[in-house]
Amino acid sequence: MMLCACAFTAHAQGNTSQTTDIKKSKKMLVVFFSRTGENYAVGNIEKGNTHIIAKMIAKETGSKLFQIETVKPYPDEYKACVDVAKTEKENNARPEVKSDIAVEDYDVIFLGFPNWWGDMPMAVYTFIEKHDWNGKTVVPFCTHEGSGLSGTERKLKDVCKGSTISKGLAVRGTTAQNSLSQARQSVEKWLKSVLQSK
C-alpha cells in the first residue's frame, strides 16, 4: 500500500473551507515535514516533494521556513519507510523531533506534509502538540500521488485548537519533482485565493 494511500476522501467543514484575509497579518511562517531517499513514483530524490513546495510558498509570501525533522531518521528504502509509517499511525505514535520554532510568535502558519496513509506523518502531530494554536490561521498543504489532502483539514481543526484552518493545497509529488512550472502555477493560484479578503 502506498504511503499516500487513504481510506477516504473528505472535505473539511466550517472554518476549513473559507478563505482568510491574511494580507494584514504581521508575521507568516512555513513549517513542513518532508522526506528524501527512495520515493514512490519519482525514485531516489535529494530534496523531498513537500520541501520543494514549501520553498515556493516561502518565496512567494516572504515567510520564514522551518523543517520538522525527526531524531530517528526514516528509512531511505521506500518499503521500509512505508512499514514504519504504518506502524506509527496504527500506534498513534509521536516520534521525537530534533528542533522547534515558536509558532506562537506568528500570525499565519503554512503547514506542509506528505500524505502518509491518508493522514499527516505522526511527527507532524508531535510538532503540533507542542504549541498553542489559539488565534492562529493555519494554511495546510500536502504532496501526494492521488489521495489529495484526505481528511487532514478536518484533523487540523481538531488538533490546532482555537485556530482557523484555511483552504488547503494538494500537489502531486511527481509534479513537484518533474514539473516545477506547473507546481509553481498551482502554488501561485492557491495563494491568490487564500490571501484574498473574505
Q: Where are the language model's segments positioned?
A:
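Solvent-exposed loop/turn segments at secondary-structure junctions
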Residues: 35-38, 70-75, 115-119, 144-149, ...
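N-terminal beta1-alpha1-beta2 submodule of the flavodoxin-like/Rossmannoid cofactor-binding fold
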Residues: 11-106, 118, 185-198
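Bacterial Sec-dependent N-terminal signal peptides
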Residues: 1-14
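Low-complexity, flexible helical/coil segments
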Residues: 62-69, 100-105, 144-152, 173-180
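Helix-loop-strand module that forms the ligand-binding subsite of alpha/beta enzymes
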Residues: 77-164
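A charged, well-structured terminal subsegment
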Residues: 165-198
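Conserved beta-strand segments of alpha/beta enzyme cores
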Residues: 62-64, 164-167
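Structural signal for conserved beta-strand scaffold positions within catalytic alpha/beta enzyme cores
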Residues: 32, 67, 140, 167-170
